[in-house]
Amino acid sequence: MARYRCCRSRSRCRRRRRRSYRRRRRCCRRRRRRVCCRRYVRCRRR
């Protein structure tokens, strides 16, 4: 599966949606690298 790289700063995730930014567009951590959650498809692919 393709992984999505998290935005440079966490503020970007919050900026997308203020209300449901916690559940849908939240920055996740995976294997040391910061990866965006599966729902956060706006991030760039890695």
From Swiss-Prot:
Record localization: Nucleus; Chromosome
Superkingdom of origin organism: Eukaryota
GO cellular component: nucleosome; nucleus
Keywords: Chromosome, Developmental protein, Differentiation, DNA condensation, DNA-binding, Nucleosome core, Nucleus, Spermatogenesis
InterPro entries in UniProt: Protamine_P1
A Gene Ontology biological process term: chromosome condensation
Listed Pfam families: Protamine_P1
Tissue expression pattern: Testis.
GO MF annotation: an example: DNA binding
Function statement: Protamines substitute for histones in the chromatin of sperm during the haploid phase of spermatogenesis. They compact sperm DNA into a highly condensed, stable and inactive complex.
Family the UniProt entry places it in: Belongs to the protamine P1 family.
Protein name: Sperm protamine P1
Organism: Glauconycteris beatrix
Lineage, broadest ranks: Eukaryota, Metazoa, Chordata, Craniata, Vertebrata
Gene (name only): PRM1
